Amino acid sequence: MSGGKKKSSFQITSVTTDYEGPGSPGASDPPTPQPPTGPPPRLPNGEPSPDPGGKGTPRNGSPPPGAPSSRFRVVKLPHGLGEPYRRGRWTCVDVYERDLEPHSFGGLLEGIRGASGGAGGRSLDSRLELASLGLGAPTPPSGLSQGPTSWLRPPPTSPGPQARSFTGGLGQLVVPSKAKAEKPPLSASSPQQRPPEPETGESAGTSRAATPLPSLRVEAEAGGSGARTPPLSRRKAVDMRLRMELGAPEEMGQVPPLDSRPSSPALYFTHDASLVHKSPDPFGAVAAQKFSLAHSMLAISGHLDSDDDSGSGSLVGIDNKIEQAMDLVKSHLMFAVREEVEVLKEQIRELAERNAALEQENGLLRALASPEQLAQLPSSGVPRLGPPAPNGPSV
């Protein structure tokens, strides 16, 4: 890519993962792809990619949304960084991955990566990605520098209509469980939330969001009955419960806040499910299941109604066409039957006239026949219809 004359590129075709657990020392190193011999790759904006060299590995290497992304595929290294080592002109780092990312988070992660581009250090989107996956931030080895800890600090706003908009677009944070339960991410950000303020500290593995809300209660059902609820109904149930508690806190006075301290009720999202406080509320898992069941039934009925509304026009059109076809066939059959009846009536009339003529002729012949001729009639099989005439011509 130097001088616009020579272009070289590489592509990682496969990455094998061999991971046994978050703290198992027996995890084997996955095979690292062989580096190419060409010049180092450049980012789509023209800047050369930085060499780690034993320092903080860049986490945000994704191209901006408008740049072409057909030559390179940027893969984030959220956790499990090993010791960097040199291989030729490249500095390589072994990565251990856990397959905890559901397929439904692909678009969310891509949107987070696209919204926060650049080549900085451990920024907000990587921390939010870790929090959305339910993973704690990794503890880097001694060879790597410890990055800043990302905090989400909301402004001290008064609780009111602004607190109703509980779902925002800044960060996707969930309370993780110890089991591999695929739960939908719970958005926790205020509309007037300020950008995060990075702080350096020794604890690089903490990412939490403190959102003060009046009498807010969210239960972290790690391994209970909430894991058996569908994701859509759970999300609707949680949203409805949050709106009910935020909208009318005076009506539900029996519900205690999340924290035992009434002065600072806050909702903390941490990377460990054991640190989450579960309030002993009367509306527990049973109420959550009832709300989720009601919302799922309403959603199913709404989908059925929309399907009926969308397909009612086509069904009515098909019924009309069938009725028109049946009417056409009926009219054709009626015309054919009428024509056949007229033809049969004509034939019956002709046969009746002929029969009358034959009977008249037969009577005349019998009147004119002789007794000898009439005596021969039974032998010929012709019945005698009348008395024989005394004199008459022979037949």
From Swiss-Prot:
Pfam families: TSC22. It is found in: Nucleus; Cytoplasm; Cell projection, Dendrite; Synapse. One of its GO terms (biological process) is neuron projection extension. Expressed in the liver. PROSITE patterns: TSC22 (PS01289). It comes from the Eukaryota. The keyword Transmembrane does not apply. The modification Phosphoserine is found at residues 49, 62, 165, 187, 189-190, 225, 260, 264, 279, 370. SUPFAM superfamilies: Delta-sleep-inducing peptide immunoreactive peptide (SSF58026). One of its GO terms (cellular component) is synapse. Belongs to the TSC-22/Dip/Bun family. Binds DNA and acts as a transcriptional repressor. Involved in the regulation of systematic glucose homeostasis and insulin sensitivity, via transcriptional repression of downstream insulin signaling targets such as OBP2A/LCN13. Acts as a negative regulator of lipogenic gene expression in hepatocytes and thereby mediates the control of very low-density lipoprotein release. May play a role in neurite elongation and survival. This is TSC22 domain family protein 4. It comes from Homo sapiens.
